[in-house]
C-alpha cells in the first residue's frame, strides 16, 4: 500500500472522521458526567490553557472594546492566534455568533 501524503483528500477525510469521533465521544462523556476527566486525559495542560485563551479571545472580539494588538498584550497570545480567531468569528454562522454573544457576554 502506498503511503498517503499528509495533504491528500483521503487523509483529510480520515482526519475529519477522527475529529467527528472525538466530538461524539465528548458528547457521550457529557451525558455521563465524565467530560472533565476525558478532557484532562485527552488534552495537555498547555492545550487546556490555549483553549481557555481562545475563549477569552472570542469573548473580547465579540465585546469589541479592544484592538487586536491590545488583546495580544492583555492575553499574552500571539497576534496570529488573535487574527485567526477574528477571521474564524467572521466566517462563523450567524446562529453560532448569536449564541456565543448570549453565552459569553451575558454578564455585560
Swiss-Prot record:
Keyword hit for Transcription: yes
Gene3D superfamilies cross-referenced by the UniProt entry: TrpR-like
DNA-binding region: 68-91
A cellular component term, taken from the record's GO annotations: cytoplasm
GO molecular function: DNA binding; DNA-binding transcription factor activity; sequence-specific DNA binding
Localisation per UniProt entry: Cytoplasm
Pfam families assigned to the protein according to its UniProt record, in alphabetical order: Trp_repressor (PF01371)
Chief place of localization: cytoplasm
GO BP terms: negative regulation of DNA-templated transcription; regulation of DNA-templated transcription
Keywords for the protein's UniProt record, in alphabetical order: Cytoplasm, DNA-binding, Repressor, Transcription, Transcription regulation
Residues spanning the membrane: none
Binding partners and assembly: Homodimer.
PANTHER family registered for this protein in UniProt: TRP OPERON REPRESSOR
Homology family: Belongs to the TrpR family.
Protein name, as recorded: Trp operon repressor
Biological source species: Escherichia coli (strain K12)
